[in-house]
Each structure stands twice: as C-alpha cells, then as structure tokens.
C-alpha cells in the first residue's frame, strides 16, 4: 500500500514541500532563516490575534487599552512584548535572509527574488502601521511624518495624504484604518510566502558554492527539519531573553507618553529596523528627492539580478566581491546608527556620505568587482 502522505491531496503538498523535498547536502545555517521567518510570522499572527481581542482602535481609548493589556489581562504583558520584540526578530531574520540571497547569488531565481522583495515591502508596511496602534507620541508623530511624505508626489500628493488620513490630520479615521490594514496584511504576507515557496520549489534551493547540486541531494526530513528546529530554539531563546529581561530595549520611551498633536517630540524616529532607510530619506535636502531615495533604497534589490556580471553565481570564490559585500553591511549599520541621531553636524554629512556609498556599492562597485574577477580567471 502506498503511504498516505504521498497520495492524500493535502498531505501530498506538505510531503513535497517539507518531507521528501530534495535539498542540497551542503546548505549552511544561512539557509535556516526562511523557516525562522515562517515561525516569526505565525508567532506574530497568534500574539496579534490575542492583542486584538483586548485592543480598541479609537484615539480616546487606544493608549489606555494597551496599558490595560499589560496591567489587567492575564499574561497580557508577555503577549504584548512578544509581539513588539517578535517584530524585531522578524526583521533581523529578514535582513539576514536578504543578505544571504545577495552573498550566495540566490537572486538569480528571478520570480522567487521578486516575490521576496514584495514580501519585504509588505512586511515594512505592516510594521509601520503596527507602530501607530499604541497611540503614543512616537506612534502619532511617526504616522504624521511618514504619511506626509506622500504629499511630495506632484499634483495628487496633498489629496492622496488627506485620503489616507480620512481627514485633515492623523486622527480617529487614520487609527481605525491602520488597525484594519495591520490585521489583514499578515494574512496577505502568509499567502505571498506560499507563492515565494512555490517558485523556490520549481528550481530547488541554491547552495553556498552556487554550483548545481542536482547530483547530490538529500531529503529535507529528517536532515533539515532537525536543523530548522535548532534554529527555531535559538530564535525563541533570543526572543524570550529580550521579552523577559529587557522588553523595552528596542522601543522608544516617547511611546509611553500618550499622543499629543500639540507637542512634537524633540527627535522623531522610527523603530530601529527602519533607521537605515530613514537616514537615506533625511540625507537629501529635497522632499521629493528624499522620498524617491527612500523607495529606491529597497526597490534597488529588484535591479540586483540585472547587475550580476560575474561568471560565478556565489561570492564564495570571489574575494573582491566579498570585501564589497561586507563594506555594504558596515555601511547599512552606519546608516542605522545615523538614522537614530539628531539632524546636526557631523551626523548630516556622515549620513549623506553613507547614503551615496550605499547606492554606489550596489550600482557600480559590485558589477565592476565582478568584471575584474572574471578577467582574473583568465590568468
């Protein structure tokens, strides 16, 4: 008799994706982040669901409903902090996952890569709207500043902003719709993640060497299921260390002050995972220019496959490209630091230099390094 997991219509899909899937025998721990992102998403949806049971999306009660969750709801504090810090873990895994894709040339799977970029945008939108919901000072002013950027769009900008606000400022209507969007988007992310996997399983996984591994495949289960469980345990360990010891380490103290449209915080800044993009936005004195640079800082990922000039797929055997990659990582860390600093000398010039370097590295230096390495192969 044939095994039920290979014949049952539903079990067959699970089997082909997680059990009998042929996987390269040499994929490293950098390939763990896909499953970790799935775990983060499930965790966020579950904690978010329980938070939504007690949260009220009204400007008069939103802030106190979050305080009520933390003080009066059974284990409400742990659910709230798991959700807030879970978002940070989500973005750490996302950045690692994208970095892995860049380093090992996984972006040559075009459909998988492009769906991944859409996933990144959607996740960023979800996180931004979630940050507005507690209705603290940084929530309110963050929403005001970021939505206001759309007014830089010629001709329709102002109308577009007022349409998104549902009025003439960030108010009740804005909060209610942000809650609605924040609730629905994770399910759209889950659907997109399935499309992402669907495209990946058309080609099979890449591996550190970037060379075809068709001749040497092993089943996903038990080898990579056990490896993913180890990764998941480490993820949960780090998350719970954050939640139980320093739950507010990555947050902003200003968000413990209820939103007040009449008093602007001295330094408006987003959550840490948006700081690199925020630094790029601020480094350009022109409003429209800044908005374009902000969008392009992420959208540039779509261009990466077109800029791949190397004869080799992975950076494993390309030392010059490796150097440039790690300079890019250092540059992004610099931008993240700058995004959290006030707009004054010397931070302004450092931010501008780091922003120029970011685009220069991806658009010019990486393709040039690849071409040099191609020529070195002839020697």
Curated annotation (Swiss-Prot):
Sequence positions that bind heme b b566: 97, 196
UniProt membrane topology term: Multi-pass membrane protein
Keywords assigned: Electron transport, Heme, Iron, Membrane, Metal-binding, Mitochondrion, Mitochondrion inner membrane, Respiratory chain, Transmembrane, Transmembrane helix, Transport, Ubiquinone
S-adenosyl-L-methionine found in the keyword field: no
Cofactor annotation remark: Binds 2 heme b groups non-covalently.
Binding site for a ubiquinone: 201
A Pfam family the protein falls into: Cytochrom_B_C
Transmembrane stretches, start-end: 33-53, 77-98, 113-133, 178-198, 226-246, 288-308, 320-340, 347-367
Compartment(s): Mitochondrion inner membrane
A GO molecular-function annotation: metal ion binding
GO annotation terms (biological process): mitochondrial electron transport, ubiquinol to cytochrome c
Cofactors (names): heme b
Residues the record lists as binding heme b b562: 83, 182
GO cellular component term, pick one: mitochondrial inner membrane
Annotated function: Component of the ubiquinol-cytochrome c reductase complex (complex III or cytochrome b-c1 complex) that is part of the mitochondrial respiratory chain. The b-c1 complex mediates electron transfer from ubiquinol to cytochrome c. Contributes to the generation of a proton gradient across the mitochondrial membrane that is then used for ATP synthesis.
Similarity comment: Belongs to the cytochrome b family.
Other comment: Heme 1 (or BL or b562) is low-potential and absorbs at about 562 nm, and heme 2 (or BH or b566) is high-potential and absorbs at about 566 nm.
UniProt name for this protein: Cytochrome b
């Amino acid at each position: 008799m044939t095994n039920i997991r290979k014949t049952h219509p539903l079990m067959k899909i699970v089997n082909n994706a997680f059990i009998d899937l042929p996987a390269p025998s040499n994929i490293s721990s950098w390939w763990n982040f896909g499953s970790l992102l799935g775990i983060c998403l499930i965790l966020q949806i579950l904690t978010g669901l329980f938070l939504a049971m007690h949260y009220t999306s009204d400007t008069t009660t939103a802030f106190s409903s979050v305080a009520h969750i933390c003080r009066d709801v059974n284990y409400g504090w742990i659910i709230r902090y798991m959700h807030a810090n879970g978002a940070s873990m989500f973005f750490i895994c996302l950045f690692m996952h994208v970095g892995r894709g860049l380093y090992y040339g996984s972006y040559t799977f075009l459909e998988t890569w492009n769906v991944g970029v859409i996933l990144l945008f959607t996740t960023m939108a979800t996180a931004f709207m979630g940050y507005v919901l507690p209705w603290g000072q940084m929530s309110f002013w963050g929403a005001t500043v970021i939505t206001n950027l759309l007014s830089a769009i010629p001709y329709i900008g102002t109308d577009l902003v007022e349409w998104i606000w549902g009025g003439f400022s960030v108010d009740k209507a804005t909060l209610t719709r942000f809650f609605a969007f924040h609730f629905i988007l994770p399910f759209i992310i889950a659907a997109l993640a399935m499309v992402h996997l669907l495209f990946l399983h058309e080609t099979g996984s890449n591996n550190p060497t970037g060379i075809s591994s068709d001749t040497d495949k092993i089943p996903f289960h038990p080898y990579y299921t056990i490896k993913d469980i180890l990764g998941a345990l480490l993820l949960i360990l780090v998350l719970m260390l954050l939640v139980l010891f320093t739950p507010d380490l990555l947050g902003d103290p200003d968000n413990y002050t209820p939103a007040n449209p009449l008093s602007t915080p001295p330094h408006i800044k987003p959550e840490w995972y948006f700081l690199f993009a925020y630094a790029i936005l601020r480094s350009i004195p022109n409003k429209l220019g800044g908005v374009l640079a902000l969008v392009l800082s992420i959208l540039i990922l779509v261009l990466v496959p077109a800029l791949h000039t190397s004869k080799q797929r992975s950076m494993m055997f390309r030392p010059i490209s490796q150097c440039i990659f790690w300079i890019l990582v250092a540059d992004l860390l610099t931008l993240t630091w700058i995004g959290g600093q006030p707009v004054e000398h010397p931070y302004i010039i450092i931010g501008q230099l780091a922003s120029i370097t970011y685009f220069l590295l991806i658009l010019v230096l990486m393709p040039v390094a690849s071409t040099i390495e191609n020529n070195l192969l002839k020697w």
